[in-house]
């Protein structure tokens, strides 16, 4: 693709970029004749009438319009879908070892594997959670998702995501967001790649409100990076793959759709380095709620309740006094899907490996394992706990995450996960009877 890789900084900004000078019209969006023989095309990510502060759209100036391709036909496959219904959902806590890497050549699209989800794209609420494992770049094919925006969380291997609006290079401990409808190709920069994907059907991801934290903190807007315009002009026999209403569809296309020479607007891919997250924590006592670790949030129609929150558990110092410092035992009205990008998660001493995943659905008890509890209960609190070399994350949703059948029956599901709490014994010592006010019998 033409143009060396550079980025523009800021979250949700109104950007303007061109790979060929003079391609952007001045003072209007759709001139009678666009410079250099390009076509003008608007890409809308929200309704035309959405409030200005929430309105997302970009104008693209491209070699051919997006409408130029063949007729779509259904791809028969069962790994990637929106089928979260039919059948009971067990309330068990669940954990999976890393998704095995493929033994045969597999690109990003073929390597997607649906784990769980809720809601639907037609209802414009909910999410789908996928894993990916690939060992080949996408050759001669391009992909777009009409169902939702994609939050990519690499765990193994670097990715070069070539999109209509420019190139995102991602490595583990960075995340990327591909807006709904944007066409792209994923190239592997290493021999294999694995990671996590949250497909957001609901309100577009945004930065959380900071409240009393103030004007700064958590993920700062200036650290988000959006690519500058880059394009390729290639003719040939290519394949365009679309995810639409939970199914994959393919169409022939005789040129690369990554042919946007210039664009302006605020609906575009972006990336963020999780190592730049400004972590907030207690410097007195107790462990604050994990909402303090929110990087991005998708709002719902209920004020104060997210459709989905993306939170991380990065390196940090724990200094709270008179306090059990690891994450506490918890039952949550929300549902939590966790993954581990790097290192060890401080609430699980064993069994939760990078590339692995866990699901704690609504009101399923969870928390530190027995080894972590015993260690933290006896820790010397005069010294800080330096949590280093780690990066865990969570997709938290207001609706139950319904695991797919392939996730429930997967060979890499850990059937003995509940045993991590089996060592938590009753240590209660009954005080003298005179100090007891009420006992159930």
Swiss-Prot record:
Gene3D superfamilies named in the record: Jelly Rolls
Classify the source by domain of life.
Bacteria
This protein's cofactor list reads: Fe cation
Matching entries from Pfam families are given as: HgmA_C, HgmA_N
Which Gene Ontology molecular-function terms are recorded? homogentisate 1,2-dioxygenase activity; iron ion binding
Could you say which residues bind homogentisate here?
345, 366
Q: What keywords are assigned to this protein?
A: Dioxygenase, Iron, Metal-binding, Oxidoreductase, Phenylalanine catabolism, Tyrosine catabolism
Q: List the active site.
A: 287 (proton acceptor)
Binding residues for Fe cation? 330, 336, 366
Any one of the GO CC terms: cytoplasm
Q: In which pathway does it act?
A: Amino-acid degradation; L-phenylalanine degradation; acetoacetate and fumarate from L-phenylalanine: step 4/6
**Gene Ontology BP annotations:** L-phenylalanine catabolic process; tyrosine catabolic process
EC class of the enzyme, as a word: oxidoreductase
Catalysed reactions, as listed in the record: homogentisate + O2 = 4-maleylacetoacetate + H(+)
Q: Under which EC number(s) is this enzyme classified?
A: 1.13.11.5
Which NCBIfam families would you find in this protein's record? hmgA
Similarity comment text for this entry: Belongs to the homogentisate dioxygenase family.
Give the record's subunit note: Hexamer; dimer of trimers.
Q: Summarize the protein's role.
A: Involved in the catabolism of homogentisate (2,5-dihydroxyphenylacetate or 2,5-OH-PhAc), a central intermediate in the degradation of phenylalanine and tyrosine. Catalyzes the oxidative ring cleavage of the aromatic ring of homogentisate to yield maleylacetoacetate.
Protein's name according to its UniProt entry: Homogentisate 1,2-dioxygenase
Q: Which organism is it from?
A: Xanthomonas oryzae pv. oryzae (strain KACC10331 / KXO85)
